[in-house]
Amino acid sequence: MREIKFRCWDRFKQRWSNYKINDGTVYFMDKNTGVWYGSYNKRYKDFNLMQYTELKDIRGKGIYEGDILFESFGERYYKVVFKNGSFRAEFKGDFEWHHFDLIDVVIQGCEVVGNIYENPELMEE
């Protein structure tokens, strides 16, 4: 069985957060004090959990939901999303968003260049 991994963005503090899962509840740790607080069930709107896709970019870096990929062949930036039960890569065309299976973009040779929280400007280009 594969290990399901996540990373956690704290929307309130605008930074990555440590977390642990105990009996289906997600708890978060304050990096400054080391104290565990809250739970995902009670404060879900303050946090975004992003799942690991089990895919890696051309440099061997793991790809997570919310990552921004650059694919040099088409010279496009893609946002990694989870929709309809699968990981997808999407980019904004002239008039609409275009969606592809993530594996198809990874095969083309993409690189993780940021994420939607720390580098939103990459998706505006």
Identify what each model region corresponds to.
Residues 1-125:
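Secondary-structure transition motif
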